[in-house]
């Protein structure tokens, strides 16, 4: 089955595990993460290009956002979204990190949730440019990676620390501290593994091949 998901991804369902390397070789494209503790997706609306209400190019911002964060691991799953106006069609206010387009810039919000317990994201900062919004997202993202407990979602993390402390230690931190956070994120990104590239040329092919059961050996 091929399914278009609510997070704007494509699910390929029902494929045998042993066939996965051949399937990805034929597709010639990377895979997103479905279950890992890391970045899941960046959902976008159509922004200024196809919507009369759009005030910012949310599609381009979302593409760049995904490029900066894909393949990175985190204490728990991270979902992101960008919307071109406050109508919030891509649900940025209930994502771990969201960018909300305004007439004169972006609101960056963090710590939202839309699952069993719904939580509206907190405002991290309001900025004028897309690059500033992306940098604010990077600061929060790396701060969360370094300071959250394992299996702690961003909404629990923000509530535990308080949004004022989060702001103080990310977007309003002294310039050297901000630069250090960003440098560590860049370094992590440079060494981020591509699990599906490894899957196409596995060191141990038995990862995708069923093992033959061992016969019982009598003493």
Each model region followed by its residue ranges:
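Small-residue-enriched alpha-helical segments and adjacent helix-cap loops
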Residues: 1-107, 201-219
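Generic structural signal for well-ordered, non-membrane alpha-helical segments
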Residues: 16, 54-58, 62, 129-133, ...
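Mobile "lid/hinge" segments at catalytic clefts and subdomain interfaces of large enzymes
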Residues: 79, 84, 88, 93-153, ...
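Glycine-centered helix-coil hinge/cap
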Residues: 162-166, 172-173
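Acidic, Ser/Thr-rich low-complexity intrinsically disordered segments
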Residues: 171-205
